[in-house]
Structures are given as C-alpha cells and as structure tokens.
Amino acid sequence: GENAAIIATGIQAKVFIVDKSSKRLNELKTKFGDQIIPLNSDEINLSDYISECDLLIGGVLVPGANAPKLISKEMITSMKRGSVIVDVAIDQGGCVATSKPTTHANPTYVVDDVVHYCVANMPGSVPMTSTLALNAVTLPFTLKLAQEGYQNALSSDANFLAGLNVCQGNVT
C-alpha cells in the first residue's frame, strides 16, 4: 500500500489511505503530509469514500490468514463507471467481495462497470525486477545469518525471531 501511495502522490493523485492501525496512519501522515488523507478502516469510511475512487488498490495483509472482505458488492456498485480495482490481496483470497483470481494471460474482468485486476503473484509479470527486489531485501538477512550463526541472529534481531517457524525439530 505504501509503495502505491508513493507512486500515486507522485502523479498528484488524491490519495486516501485506509488502515486499522492509528499508529501506522500517523506514520504515513508524517511521511506524506498533506498529500494523503488517512482514514480508519471501518465500513462507514469505506462506504463514504469509495464512490470517489478512480483506482482502488486493496493491499490488505493478515499474516497466516485469508484477507478480510473489506469491500462489499454494494460498495462496488457505488463506484464510478470505468473505475479500476487492483486486489493485491488476491493471493490471500482477496479483500473485495467481487474479486476472483485472474492470470497474466487474462488479467481483467468487469463487474458493475468496474474493472477488476486480480492477478495472483503480480511480481511474476516482471520476474527480473522482482528477483532483484527480493534479493535486495533478503541479502542483509542472509549475510547476518552467515556471519553470526542462527543462534546469535535469533537472540540479537527480533526480525529473525519473528520469522522462526521450526527450531531443532520443534514448531515454534
């Protein structure tokens, strides 16, 4: 969501960011200032503002669970004709009631005059770029693990500890 906001504010779009976390909304407001309108994620805010959307990007992530359906069919019908929904959460079931997985070969479909783009594994459309991005993000962790060993890395870095699933034959 934040990366989409960077691009959208860069082209002077009116950007609403919806999140459940007030702390996260404050962080984003500090970063973007008056370029964004932060909103608490609730049905009233979503219903009030969705009719203004030309582009809705659903970037919901609940680690280890399906994405909640935040956008109802009724909300979709209130959107402008030709509006676009990009449901990035489609890999976790999607956050829009009318979303269904599509492919790179057949990426879009229309429901109630609203275009839906719900391609699972969106980074797969740019494999070289996504591989470089993944390597850039994971390399520091790989180097730390190689330099410190897994036990020191786990004890000195909360990110490693949060990512631990199995250790010495035990599910953590």
Label each region the model flagged.
Residues 20-22, 43, 61-62, 89-95, ...:
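Short, ordered loop/turn segments at secondary-structure junctions
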Residues 3, 19-23, 41, 48-55, ...:
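Conserved active-site and cofactor/substrate-binding residues in soluble primary-metabolism enzymes
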Residues 8, 30-33, 53, 70-73, ...:
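Short, glycine/charged-enriched secondary-structure capping and boundary segments
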Residues 16, 39, 84-86, 117:
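Hydrophobic/aromatic beta-strand patches that form the interior of the parallel beta-sheet core
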Residues 90, 95-172:
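Adenosine-phosphate binding glycine-rich loop
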Residues 58-111, 115:
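ADP-ribose/adenylate-binding Rossmann-like module
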Residues 11-13, 34, 67, 81-84, ...:
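Structural beta-strand/beta-sheet cores of well-ordered domains, especially the beta-sheet scaffolds
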Residues 1-61:
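Glycine-rich phosphate/diphosphate-binding loop of Rossmann-like nucleotide-binding domains
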